[in-house]
């Protein structure tokens, strides 16, 4: 068996094309275009790359993009004041604060300062709580994008044994809620998990998000499993690798996401979808 690659890049491009058409239709109907404020604090190279990709995607689909590049020494109070201003700006439908933040700024305080109806990253406790209550509105972008990828396989998720490796607030925890909502029996593994290999081998659907290249050996993959690799790790030779040993895993899986070109583009596509949703549902 050789796994089919799930082409996140192509699927994300299709979503962006559809969004561009919807934005054009809004303009023709005399409605304003959706607006996204992107806030970057500091000069972390990886964050700068991510923010640049998000801003370019905004412009591609015709959104209003507001950029705020703040110095590393920006105080927490100054950042919160900027968020307050964006909260009250009628041209802005979504606010994104790129994480991680400098150590002197408390991330939870910043996330909770963003109005839930403008929380297009889906990190606010209100929006995570909506997902937990099975009434999602603005959903965490990476898990949302992963669910879109899984749907393209045509495989029915109801009754599948799903295993998530990694329990972060950004991916692992909301991912478990998404898969629970999709009818899976979910297991979330983390640093204290015992017998990780045994749990991974039982997974019909495996999502790995730990940030360690090749962390999951390919021979652990159950024959016919769907493998979603969230990891983006830069190796010493400059190449990118995922958290799963791709070649060996491809011999067992039925579907697998490549790195790069799998989950990454879908995160940005989901961010754009959330921004349009916020404009249509909350601010029109």
From Swiss-Prot:
A GO cellular component term found in this entry reads: cytosol
What domain of life?
A: Bacteria
Q: Does the record's keyword annotation contain Hydrolase?
A: yes
Family of this protein: Belongs to the tetrahydrofolate dehydrogenase/cyclohydrolase family.
Pathway info: One-carbon metabolism; tetrahydrofolate interconversion
**What is known about what this protein does?**
Catalyzes the oxidation of 5,10-methylenetetrahydrofolate to 5,10-methenyltetrahydrofolate and then the hydrolysis of 5,10-methenyltetrahydrofolate to 10-formyltetrahydrofolate.
Looking at the keywords, is NAD present?
Answer: no
Its recorded name reads Bifunctional protein FolD
Catalyses: (6R)-5,10-methylene-5,6,7,8-tetrahydrofolate + NADP(+) = (6R)-5,10-methenyltetrahydrofolate + NADPH; (6R)-5,10-methenyltetrahydrofolate + H2O = (6R)-10-formyltetrahydrofolate + H(+)
Transmembrane ranges? none
The processes (GO biological process) annotated in the record are: L-histidine biosynthetic process; methionine biosynthetic process; purine nucleotide biosynthetic process; tetrahydrofolate interconversion
């Amino acid at each position: 068996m050789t796994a089919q690659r799930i082409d996140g890049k192509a699927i994300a491009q299709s979503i962006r094309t559809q969004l561009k058409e919807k934005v054009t239709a809004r303009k023709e109907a005399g409605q304003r275009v959706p607006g996204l404020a992107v806030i970057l604090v500091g000069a972390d190279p990886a964050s700068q790359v991510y923010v640049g990709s998000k801003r370019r995607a905004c412009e591609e689909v015709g959104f209003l993009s507001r950029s705020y590049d703040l110095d590393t020494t920006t105080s927490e109070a100054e950042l919160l004041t900027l968020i307050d201003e964006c909260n009250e700006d009628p041209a802005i439908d979504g606010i994104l604060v790129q994480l991680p933040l400098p150590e002197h700024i408390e991330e939870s305080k910043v996330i909770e300062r963003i109005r839930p109806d403008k929380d297009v990253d889906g990190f606010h406790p209100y929006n995570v709580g909506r997902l937990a209550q099975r009434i999602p509105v603005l959903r965490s972008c990476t898990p949302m994008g992963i669910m879109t990828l899984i749907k393209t396989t045509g495989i029915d998720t109801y009754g599948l044994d799903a295993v998530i490796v990694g329990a972060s607030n950004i991916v692992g925890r909301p991912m478990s809620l998404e898969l629970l909502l999709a009818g899976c029996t979910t297991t979330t593994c983390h640093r204290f998990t015992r017998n990780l290999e045994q749990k991974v081998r039982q997974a019909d659907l495996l999502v790995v998000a730990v940030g360690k290249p090749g962390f999951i050996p390919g021979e652990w993959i159950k024959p016919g499993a769907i493998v979603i690799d969230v990891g983006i790790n830069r190796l010493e030779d400059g190449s990118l690798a995922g958290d799963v040993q791709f070649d060996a895993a491809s011999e067992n899986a039925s579907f697998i996401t490549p790195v790069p070109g799998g989950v990454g583009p879908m995160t940005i596509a989901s961010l754009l979808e959330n921004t349009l949703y916020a404009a249509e549902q909350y601010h029109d």
